């Protein structure tokens, strides 16, 4: 499953859990680092696509930018916890990095975990 997982985990965690009980599942989270922090660009007008409402956001505020980063970190932690609880493996790909190397690293690490798990089962 490939997603940015920005929606509330309540909307996708249960279907992911059901999928993971029947299949080997890898949740691939695509992250744009520009969404993890808020740049100081002055007064920013944002529009809610659902309601059409607009809001002015004073991005010069250090306090606001710090709260934004904190909320983004909390959202990422909640996403990781929900994916783990659903029984899926979690691969994070960032748009500012070489995603191919991240995939290779993930496959090597995953293969080692599976091998270790199987070796542990054989020792019983």
Positions of predicted regions on the chain:
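Von Willebrand factor type A / integrin I
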Residues: 7-124
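Acidic beta-strand-to-loop metal/phosphate-binding motif
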Residues: 1-4
